[in-house]
């Protein structure tokens, strides 16, 4: 399962097929999958995720011409029987101690665990909480004047748990470290202007087969935003535009709306390309 490319498809195949034939090796990532094979005469590798695999790539290069004359790779599983490196162990402990005062600072409280588990419609309680928080931070005039916020599900990396952490803050208290575990990225919030038609396009781009989207990625939404969709409908036509409402009022396809997303999405991340066209960014 770690070498080979059984069932490989999607963006990585399309990307490799567009490369110049002069490219010999593609060391890829971001998919979190493990693969190692030749695609379009190029050696393509990926080492899964979170340090579970190390890829050993072996190239033979003709010194006279600079050309690669042979190439091979092997994905090696990282096992737990390797002794810890004393230098790295000490370095990690040092920076954990430096970060502890910030990581252990209590920033809020909850009365129960809030999970990222999605329902049949693709929404999660934690995703909606994050979208609500993003909306709350940007809806005032001067701070964005947003009417809706969207959050990508892939950016939610853990549940927000009620039980206290080893830091000893106590049950129900949320620390900065716990919130960082939920969203461990350096993203900022971006509020932009979209038309109603662009919001409809954004919702269509959640679904596999619309534009460059190769998987369903249901955006988490702030309170007051509603719409209907059918998975059985054709690609790019799954959302009923007449059903898209903000606080019960249907959107106008030619009207303009202030929309908040994180900077990853604002740059077209996860193939939500219409967000690149947003104007009046703040």
Regions found by a protein language model. Give the residues of each.
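Active-site-adjacent helix-turn-beta-strand microarchitecture at beta-sheet edges
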Residues: 5-105, 211-221, 234, 238-241, ...
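N-terminal short leaders/motifs
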Residues: 1-18, 130-131, 135-140, 201
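Glycine-rich phosphate/diphosphate-binding loops and the adjacent beta-loop-alpha structural elements
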Residues: 103-123
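Feature captures C-terminal
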Residues: 38-42, 67-72, 124, 128-282
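Extracytoplasmic/periplasmic, Sec-exported soluble proteins
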Residues: 7, 26, 51, 83, ...
């Amino acid at each position: 399962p770690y070498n080979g490319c059984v069932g490989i498809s999607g963006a990585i195949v399309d990307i490799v097929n567009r490369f110049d034939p002069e490219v010999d090796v593609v060391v890829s990532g971001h998919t979190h999958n493990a693969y190692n094979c030749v695609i379009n005469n190029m050696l393509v590798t990926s080492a899964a995720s979170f340090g579970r695999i190390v890829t050993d790539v072996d190239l033979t290069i003709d010194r006279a011409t600079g050309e690669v004359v042979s190439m091979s790779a092997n994905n090696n599983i990282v096992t737990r029987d390797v002794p810890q490196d004393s230098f790295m162990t000490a370095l990690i402990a040092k920076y954990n101690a430096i970060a502890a005062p910030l990581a252990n600072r209590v920033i809020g409280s909850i009365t129960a665990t809030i999970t990222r588990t999605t329902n049949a419609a693709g929404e999660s309680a934690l995703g909606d909480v994050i979208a609500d928080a993003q909306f709350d931070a940007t809806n005032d005039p001067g701070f964005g004047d947003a009417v809706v916020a969207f959050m990508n599900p892939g950016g939610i990396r853990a549940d927000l748990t009620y039980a206290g952490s080893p830091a000893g803050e106590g049950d129900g208290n949320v620390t900065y470290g716990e919130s960082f575990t939920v969203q461990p990225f350096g993203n900022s919030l971006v509020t932009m202007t979209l038309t109603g038609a662009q919001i409809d396009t954004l919702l269509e781009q959640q679904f596999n087969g619309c534009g460059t989207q190769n998987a369903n990625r249901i955006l988490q939404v702030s309170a007051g935003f509603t719409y209907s969709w059918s998975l059985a409908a054709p690609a790019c036509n799954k959302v009923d535009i007449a059903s898209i409402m903000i606080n019960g009022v249907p959107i106008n396809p030619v009207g303009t709306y202030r929309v908040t997303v994180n900077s990853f999405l604002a740059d077209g991340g996860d193939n939500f390309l219409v967000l690149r066209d947003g104007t009046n960014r703040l």
